[in-house]
From Swiss-Prot:
InterPro entries: AAA+_ATPase (IPR003593), Chromosome_initiator_DnaA (IPR001957), Chromosome_initiator_DnaA-like (IPR020591), Chromosome_initiator_DnaA_CS (IPR018312), DnaA_C (IPR013159), DnaA_dom (IPR013317), DnaA_N_dom (IPR024633), DnaA_N_sf (IPR038454). One of its GO terms (cellular component) is plasma membrane. GO terms for biological process: DNA replication initiation; regulation of DNA replication. This is Chromosomal replication initiator protein DnaA. SUPFAM superfamilies: P-loop containing nucleoside triphosphate hydrolases, TrpR-like.
């Protein structure tokens, strides 16, 4: 029994490293170990849909992990229905108690799990297919690091900040819906997440869900494939607050726009708060239904513009303080003067300064700053290209030529470190040079899953900030793609 638990813990630890926080929470946080008989490990799932999805998405990877860890003969079985539980000689009473214990463990780890879940289990004598554990929607997606307290206010974002704070204090009252629009890296997501976190603090009974437009789309498509559209509609139309990030990603996608239209109406009629973010005004959205655009303009539309010099200085100072580095005033002003794009680039500049200090053990001077600024400006210029300007085949040609690989390498399943690294880079470049979704990118790279592509993109993004060699390689590849 104990060995089985240990093996399951190894599997969870390995998968956690490969998935985003929200994906791991969605698929693995509410699974629990039941028993281990011989070489079979039994894992209980909260409902049949969850069981089917975990098997479909992760069975192959779990088997690979078992082989890697030296447990090739072990089999992991996911169970749900009462009949299955009885087949495994597990009394329904025991399962109910284990479910309660598991639920209490989850509540200890995460205070925001719906207390309703515990009531459901405590008030039932058996764990059956109809008695699902309902976990509060909001929690996996809200990141506690985003708060109103650490949002730096300036003339470019003060109105958006004040509106967001007002919404969190009085959701569904004044500004419903609210749409915050502006360029990349200006703080839209920070404000959106801050609304969720503050509302959660002030209105503990609220069902709050933050979701990106891409994940909203992916979940909708998946619900169609699995005939679970009713579950999807119920999830999104019974919220107290919907926070939908990057709605511009839904352009040219009529099906999901139709679903969002009906979700909007359902929430609006019930006076439930909705906040959206976009990289442009609703009127500028392309291939977006007029009736949906008109819904966005019913409430408050507020923009965030690029930070002015004073705000840029404040942002750099705060980031430097968080990273534990001292930036001389002349260097600080130089970065603020040269990097005028957005907050993300300002913070990236400080991160790169820290990398130079930590990895090369040198003092910051204007030469280093100039080099870093050139890298950031080159990266921004690279990302101004549209999918029409950058051909997907050009990206592939550069990757194959510069990294000395073949089509089979880049689209196959080789585990060789250099090939795996190349696939990560390929996914990252496709994401940055095109408007392809992670699902579409996965198809290009040999049928990889959404979670695999997301892992690749996030890995390269993190590596660029802490590994100068990787960062220089990416910049070099980007330059060659532009020239190709």
């Amino acid at each position: 029994m104990q060995e089985g638990k240990n093996i399951w813990s190894l599997i969870l630890a390995a998968i956690r490293k490969e998935l985003s926080e929200e994906e791991f929470y969605i698929w693995f946080e509410n699974l629990y170990f039941i028993d281990a008989i011989g070489e079979n490990i039994k894992i209980a799932t909260p409902n049949s849909f969850h069981k089917n999805q975990v098997e479909k998405r992760f069975s192959k990877r779990i088997k690979e992990i078992l082989i890697e860890k030296g447990h090739s003969t072990i089999n992991v079985e996911f169970i749900h229905s009462q009949n299955e539980l009885k087949d495994h000689n597990t009394e329904s009473k025991d399962i109910s108690l284990k479910a309660i214990t598991h639920q209490q463990d989850l509540q200890t780890k995460n205070k925001d799990i719906k207390t309703h879940a515990k009531n459901i289990i405590n008030n039932t004598k058996q764990y059956s297919i109809k008695e699902e554990i309902h976990i509060k929607y909001r929690n996996p997606f809200l990141k506690k690091k985003y708060t109103f307290e650490n949002f730096i206010i300036g003339t470019n974002n003060k109105l958006a900040y004040n509106a967001s704070l007002s919404i969190a204090k009085n959701p569904g009252k004044k500004y419903n819906p609210c749409l915050i629009y502006g360029g990349v890296g200006l703080g839209k997501t920070h404000l959106l997440q801050s609304i969720g976190n503050k509302t959660e603090e002030l209105h503990k009974e609220f069902k709050i869900l933050y979701v990106t437009a891409e994940n909203f789309l992916n979940e909708f498509v998946e619900s169609i494939k699995t005939n679970e559209t009713k579950r999807f509609k119920k999830k999104y139309r019974h919220l107290d607050m919907l926070l939908l990030d990057d709605i511009h990603d839904l352009q040219k996608k009529e099906g999901i726009q139709e679903e969002l239209f009906h979700t909007f109406n359902a929430l609006y009629e019930d006076n439930k708060q909705m906040v959206f973010t976009c990289d442009r005004q609703p009127s500028e959205l392309v291939n977006f239904t007029d009736r949906l655009k008109s819904r966005f303009t019913r409430g408050l539309n507020v923009d965030i513009s690029k930070p002015n010099f004073e705000l840029r200085v404040a942002i750099i100072e705060k980031k430097a303080e968080e990273d534990g580095i001292k930036v001389p005033k002349n260097i600080l002003n130089l970065v603020a003067k040269k990097v005028t794009t957005n907050i993300r680039d300002l913070e990236a500049a400080v991160t790169k300064l820290k990398a130079h200090i930590d990895l090369e053990d040198i003092e910051i001077d204007t030469n280093i700053v100039d080099k870093i600024i050139k890298e950031i400006i080159a990266y921004e210029n690279d990302n101004t290209n549209t999918p029409n300007k950058i051909n997907i085949e050009n990206i592939k040609k550069v990757i194959l030529r510069e990294l000395k690989l073949t089509n089979k390498d880049i689209e196959g399943n080789s585990k060789k470190p250099e090939i795996t690294k190349a696939r990560h880079i390929y996914a990252y470049l496709l994401r940055n040079f095109t408007e392809l979704s992670t699902i579409e990118i996965g198809k290009i790279i040999g049928g990889k899953t959404h979670s695999t592509v997301l892992y690749s993109i996030n890995k390269i993004d993190k590596d660029r900030n802490k590994n100068l060699e990787i960062n220089n390689l990416i910049i070099e590849l980007m330059n060659k793609i532009n020239k190709n």
